[in-house]
Amino acid sequence: MADGCGTGKEPPYPGAAAALRRWEQLRRRAAAPWARGLLAVAAGLGLFYAALRVPLRLRDGLAAVTVFLSTLTPKFYFALTVTSSFISGLIFVFEWWHFRKYGTSFIEQVSVSHLRPLIGGVENSPPAPAAFSAGENEANRQNMPECKMWRNPLNLFRGAEYSRYMWVTGKEPLTYYDMNLSAQDHQNFFTCDTDALRPSDTVMQKAWRERNPQARIKAAYQALELNNDCATAYVLLAEEEATTIVDAERYFKQALKAGEMIYRKSQNCHSQSPQHEAQLRRDTNVLVYVKRRLAMCARKLGRIRESVKMMRDLMKEFPLLSMLNIHENLLEALLELQAYADVQAVLAKYDDISLPKSAAICYTAALLKARAVSERFSPETAFKRGLSTAEINAVEAIHRAVEFNPHVPKYLLEMKSLVLPPEHILKRGDSEAVAYAFFHLQHWKRIEGALHLLHCTWEGTFRMIPYPLEKGHLFYPYPSCTETADRELLPTFHEVSVYPQKELPFFIHFTAGLCSFSAMLALLTHQFPELMVVFAKAVLRVLWPVSAPSVLASG
């Protein structure tokens, strides 16, 4: 049987194969371009010293430098160590700032990008067949569906909720990036190519592009003056001008009346031309949006059964619009009714391997499994007798949910404070975790022992997936794009949760140690100047033993 070195013979003694492998690794490294370059530089310096040591009198120059160093006062050593400590401290602070902002070490980045090519580039050894290159991995991760921005199915109302929060706290709950995505959504949902034929729709087309909220509201009133049945104008007023949910519901009811009338007209003539078909799609989007928001208004006003009925009717009437994730609104309303059998029926339909997952799907499934065992669950008892089948199923469901979105448990366990959810989320990211926990924390608290079971088991997921960026267990490897996108979606006063936690680069530890060591030397030099001078001379004798007699003579 051939060993790892390819000799085709058995090793003569135990451990010989390991020694041969180490020797082979050293030989390959010595054959690398950068190693050959270092050997060439060392050989050149040796030849330079051998050829020119007599003309240049290097030994005499070294002795002169040693004499100069031996005559320096303690103040010089103190100033030197203070300066070294200050410079290394500046480097440490800059490295820390660069790491916190960009997630990489500046020194390592410069070394890899600029210095490494100068000393020979990368090694020639081919990559392992099963591994992707860094560029391919990054491209694959960027192409994964988890890195796509999704509209938050449970997003709040700007006028009735987000604006009220800003009035009370003085903090802006939405980022410009998030609002810009919403503006793009509104243009896609509520406009079409035939808007130029209707003056009111032309005004609304401009309104959706406006950045100033007051300008948008003013444009909506202008559209209503031109056409009192402009459904999109009522939608804008309900979203942004209404300061209460009751006012928003009133506007949406007016939008529903106008939207149904326009939708029926579009249905009758949609086959006449592609423009009419595009208008029907737009009118369908408006009608679905209005009905969904009316159901959400009913949910917020306590009419939960009415809200559930409206959502079920909407899903039956427009089954092809499942990408709007109306089922997540339905799940939350059913959990509020504590209709757990109906929740399980919805999960059976949408928790399918062929459909996109979400935190709402995964954590609701885990909640139902935990509900069956949480009241009787005890870590001590489980440790003694082992887990039952139902407990194993609950723990596995929690591990599955945590693998999909590892940020959620800290919010459910109230280890991190919540903020208002953004209008868009990134699946598996902190933004999705905030949106889920904001609406579902009360449902976990309602089931006795569910949070206790989550607290005891959720961290076990990370032992199953030690390197989540490289390998997943039940899902794709965790995408690397979440942190950057979440920082764009979530407000600046919120501390974004990062997974996996990045280890501090080597040079941060190195500069911190160098700064501390030089500061300690400066303090010792200031307190014990004579002793530190003796120590410095001893170091010089160790570094340059040839010149030691001159050092002793000068001392």
From Swiss-Prot:
Has the keyword Lipid biosynthesis been applied to this entry? no
Pfam families from the xrefs? ST7
> Membrane topology for this entry?
Multi-pass membrane protein
Under InterPro entries, the record lists: ST7 (IPR007311), TPR-like_helical_dom_sf (IPR011990)
Which UniProt key words apply to this protein? Membrane, Transmembrane, Transmembrane helix
> Which CDD domains does UniProt cross-reference here?
ST7 (cd11557)
| Transmembrane feature ranges | 32-52, 76-96, 504-524, 531-551
Record's subcellular location:
Membrane
- Which Gene Ontology CC terms are recorded? membrane
Gene3D superfamilies in alphabetical order: Tetratricopeptide repeat domain (1.25.40.10)
**Family from the record:** Belongs to the ST7 family.
Instruction: Quote the PANTHER family the UniProt record gives.
Output: SUPPRESSION OF TUMORIGENICITY 7, SUPPRESSOR OF TUMORIGENICITY 7 PROTEIN-LIKE
Indicate what this protein is called per its UniProt record.
Answer: Suppressor of tumorigenicity 7 protein-like
